[in-house]
A protein has these predicted regions:
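Aliphatic-rich helix starts adjacent to a transmembrane/signal segment
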Residues: 1-43
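Residue-level detector of alpha-helical recognition elements and their boundaries
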Residues: 22, 28, 59-62, 66, ...
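Weak global preference for isoleucine
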Residues: 3-7, 19, 78, 109, ...
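A short, surface-exposed beta-strand/turn
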Residues: 119-137
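Low-complexity, Gly/Pro-rich coil/beta segments used as flexible assembly/activation regions
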Residues: 41-42, 46-110, 114, 131-146
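Residues embedded in well-ordered secondary-structure elements
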Residues: 29, 33, 98-100, 118
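Acidic/proline-rich low-complexity IDRs
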Residues: 9-10, 63, 120
Length: 146
């Protein structure tokens, strides 16, 4: 075997090693982003659950609840994530519906979770839910939910 073919094989193997290192590195980054994305989605879902509880925690009000905040409320208790939760009446600002002697109002709660750790890419997930709250005028004791 000549020296030229030996150098060629050495360079070929070095290039293959560099390509393999790049593939392994990118797959590790992708796996880490998948984990961060899953955690961000769970944080957003926790924000939605918090928002649902804020609407009517005990069902002890005889009147329909209102949104807890139309401007985003930022939750700081979920570590490594900034979760902002917003409530809006759906589809309009004060729309209520009457159905069979019951009064209904629909709310949309949106929670957005963003990873706060410094990363080259921003990881962000959003969860959204629409919920109907109902009051029945014939119910005279709490809980007043229909």
């Amino acid at each position: 075997m000549s020296i030229i073919s030996a150098i060629f094989l050495l360079l070929l193997f070095a290039a293959l090693a560099a390509i393999m290192a790049q593939v392994v590195s990118s797959s590790n980054t992708t796996a880490a982003q998948d984990v961060q994305g899953s955690r961000a989605l769970q944080a957003a879902q926790a924000g939605v659950e918090w928002g649902l509880f804020q609407l009517d925690p005990n069902g002890d009000s005889a009147t329909l609840p209102s949104c807890f905040a139309t401007n985003p409320t930022v939750l700081t208790t979920i570590s490594d994530y900034q979760v902002s939760v917003r409530c809006t009446p759906y589809p309009g600002a004060t729309t209520t519906y009457a159905e069979g002697g019951k009064t209904l109002r629909v709310f949309e709660i949106t929670a957005t979770a963003r990873a706060t750790a410094s990363q080259p890419l921003t990881i962000e997930r959003e969860a959204r839910v629409r919920v109907e709250k109902c009051r029945d005028s014939t119910i005279t004791v709490a809980p007043f939910d229909c």
